C-alpha cells in the first residue's frame, strides 16, 4: 500500500506545489528578502495552512495544519530563539471538547518553558515538567475564574506534545495521544526506519489501562469499553491532559456541566493527570528527522509509512505531503475521491477526518555538534481562522 501511496503523491505533486530548500544567504541579506522567502513558503488553501520550509537553530522544519472540526481544536507553535535559550522548541496541542485549552497551551507552554529554563541548568526534564505544571495551573485558574459564567470551560482539555532540541540533546514531553516519531538511518545501506519517541496516554493501550487500574484499585469502572473503544470513566480516551478540570477536581463535577461529562459518584483524587512523560535523547549522526503530529495523522498512517514519505521526497512541503497522504487514506476508507473530500465544508468535515497538525524537524547534526546555529530567530503559529 505504501508504494501505491508514494506513486500517488508523486503523480499529484502539482496539486500542492512545493518550494525548493532556500539557498544559503550571507548575514547581510535584507529583511525584505527574508520576508519574500517566508511569503513564498507559506500559504493557505481552504481548510489547509502550511509553511513549507524554514530554517531554525536545529536545522530546518516544515509545518502544516488541516482543519477537520467546525471550530479548529488543534494548535501548534515553533520557537527557535536566541540566547539565553538557544534551542528549537516545538509544540503540538490537540484540544477536545472545545479549542480553549489548546489555545491557552499554545499561548503559554513554550514561554513558560523559556522561563523555567532560564536558570543556570538550562533545559532539563525538570524545567519542562515545571513548564507543564505552570501551564496547567494557569488554565485551571481560568476555569475557576469563569466557573459561574462559563462552566463548560471545566470540560475543555488538550493533549500536549512538546519537543526541544538544545545543543545535541532532544527532549520529548507528552500528555495524551499525539506522537513524535524519529526517522533514522540503520545498517550499511542507510535504510530509513521509524522509532516512536513519545508515550501515548490513551485507554486503548493495555499498559495505560493497567496503570489506571493500579492507581484506582477501588474503582472497577475506572476504564470502560464503549462501542469498541476504551475510555476513562466511559467518557474520555486520554488518561493525561492539560485541563479537563471536571476529572481532576470534584468541585466541577456538578449539574452545571453537560450531562455527558458528569460522573454519577464523587471522587476524592484526580482521575486524569497533567504529569507529562518525558524522554531525553542524545542525538546521533544517523538521526535524520522527527515528525511531531496530532493523532489525526496517525489514524491513517503508520510510523513507517510516515517516515518513508518524508525520506523519499524533498524536504520542502514535507508536512503538507504527510497531511495529503492521510487525507487520501481517509477518502479511500470512505470509498470517495480525494478531490470530493476536499470540497466538504468544515461544518461536516469531522465525519471524515480530525484536525491534523504536522511538524517535521530536519536535524542538522553537524551544525549542532559544532555549536553553531543557522538562521535568525524563528516563531511560527498556524494562521488558520478558528
From Swiss-Prot:
Enzyme class, first EC level, given as a word: hydrolase
Cofactor note: Binds 2 magnesium or manganese ions per subunit.
Residue stretches making up the PPM-type phosphatase domain: 60-363
Residues noted as binding Mn(2+) 1 in the record, renumbered to the chain: 94-95
Highest taxon, organism lineage: Eukaryota
Alphabetical list of InterPro entries matching this protein: PP2C, PPM-type-like_dom_sf, PPM-type_phosphatase-like_dom
Annotated Mn(2+) 2 binding sites: 94, 295, 354
EC number: 3.1.3.16
PANTHER family assigned to the protein according to its UniProt record, in alphabetical order: PROTEIN PHOSPHATASE
Official protein name in the record: Probable protein phosphatase 2C 36
UniProt source species: Oryza sativa subsp. japonica
